[in-house]
Amino acid sequence: MTKRDLHNEGGDENKPRKKQKSEKQKKEKSAKSKSSAEQSLSYVQSPALGDVPQSEIEKFLTENSIKITDTSSENVMRPIISFSHLPPCKDDLYAPLSSFKSPTSIQSATWPLLFAGRDVIGIAETGSGKTLAFGLPCLKKIQDSAMTKQKPYRPLAVIISPTRELAMQIYDQLLKFSGSVGVRVACVFGGVRKEEQREALKTAGVVVATPGRLKDLQNDGSVDLGKVKYLVLDEADRMLDKGFEQDIKDIIRPMPVSKRQTIMFTATWPPSVRDLASTFMSSPVTVTIGGDPSADPRANTRIKQVVEVVKPHEKESRLVQLLNRSQRGVPEPEKVLAFCLYKKEAMRIERLLRTKGFKVAGIHGDLSQQERFRSLDAFKTGAATVLVATDVAARGLDIPSVKQVINVTFPLTVEDYVHRIGRTGRAGAEGHAVTLFTETDKAQSGALINVLRAAKQDIPEDLLKFGTTVKKKQHDAYGAFFKNVDTDKTATKIVFDD
């Protein structure tokens, strides 16, 4: 479906109709822009934030690598650098913030914009506090609008995430804040029965969902999205990678345009995500934390990266040696996340470590939803100190206090490598990542070397021997010959000579 079709289900049977639809879209976009401008007037900067010297604001933005791009306004809103700078709220919405020292970079930069009702694109690494960045303004918006009691099966806010685990994580975080404002939150995802989810949707003001299950519930009439005022697409790049673009378009189609605030969070900024943003968002403000998101992937500089070049048959014994060092003979065993490439490999490694006496749990595609939750819970509580995972756990999961990531097998792309090791070194902490690299991975050596150099990490001579050439990026289905094509562009007429 093209951008033109988003609010035009009737097709292009004739020219006048197409023109009429185009004019309607312009009116909708104009109404949306007007609505955003009016909403921005509702945010009043706190006097305490206004008293902060401009030099201190600029220093904060520079030190935290924050870039704010607003093409529709020359006046950039000041970041909320302290919880005391938050706008006034009813009840005890901010009470749970007492367990945090200060806002994260993404929260500081996006909160003023989101409280003002602007559409926002947030580009930041995982583990940066994105859930509260979009969650707090969402709950405050519902609270301020006195819409805590809405009609059955008609949520006011929808948050879409790529995985069940991430959806549950967002849900758990929102529950800590939603009770004080009387907003019910529902979480819907695949792999479990729909009956309980339908019951939860009846009274939910906020719905956290994976795209596949939400579309199913939407199609069978279990939820009406016609009153949604607040839409969040979390980890948009990951959802597109997983093939959810059409599902997302179908989900958004019935939502109002002029009164909807849309927020998109992503770790990368490829053309596919840019196209999605231009389709659903109106004059969004882009907030980037870190370097250029369209450039080569960069690892968190707080993570110490170690690459060991080994023979394939040496990987398992080396893994056991590394775990012996962090799990045995120490006052408190460290939490270690061990990544495998395929689920069969993960199952084999999990069995091996269990026979060696390690407290281990696993998370991969062959496990039921309940088994995956049990594994994650065991790892979070310390009942298991080693979690063996496939890349299903590589993005978005907030597992606190992970001291070390071990890549038993190198992933298919260096982007996945960066996301994997990003499970450690979160929330300002130091992290450690060990990668067991073999000759079968040599096609990725050049890209890996670039990541190591960018983070000023040591590069082993054995890795340099594989070469520094970076393999051309390929599309999953179309290989190296893939290129992005504007599907809205009129086709060129080709005439052949006789």
UniProtKB/Swiss-Prot annotation:
A biological process term (GO) from this entry: endonucleolytic cleavage in ITS1 upstream of 5.8S rRNA from tricistronic rRNA transcript (SSU-rRNA, 5.8S rRNA, LSU-rRNA)
Motif (DEAD box): 234-237
Positions bound to ATP: 124-131
Protein family membership: Belongs to the DEAD box helicase family. DDX5/DBP2 subfamily.
UniProt function note: ATP-dependent RNA helicase required for 60S ribosomal subunit synthesis. Involved in efficient pre-rRNA processing, predominantly at site A3, which is necessary for the normal formation of 25S and 5.8S rRNAs.
Protein's name in the database: ATP-dependent RNA helicase dbp3
Subcellular location: Nucleus, Nucleolus
GO cellular component: nucleolus; preribosome, large subunit precursor
Basic and acidic residues composition-biased segments: 1-15, 22-31
GO molecular function (one): RNA helicase activity
UniProt source species: Aspergillus oryzae (strain ATCC 42149 / RIB 40) (Yellow koji mold)
Region described as Disordered: spans on this chain: 1-47
Keyword set includes Transcription: no
UniProt keyword Nuclease present: no
Free-text note on domains in this protein's UniProt record: The Q motif is unique to and characteristic of the DEAD box family of RNA helicases and controls ATP binding and hydrolysis.
Catalytic activity: ATP + H2O = ADP + phosphate + H(+)
Domain Helicase C-terminal intervals: 318-467
Key words, A-Z: ATP-binding, Helicase, Hydrolase, Nucleotide-binding, Nucleus, Ribosome biogenesis, RNA-binding, rRNA processing
EC number assigned by the record: 3.6.4.13
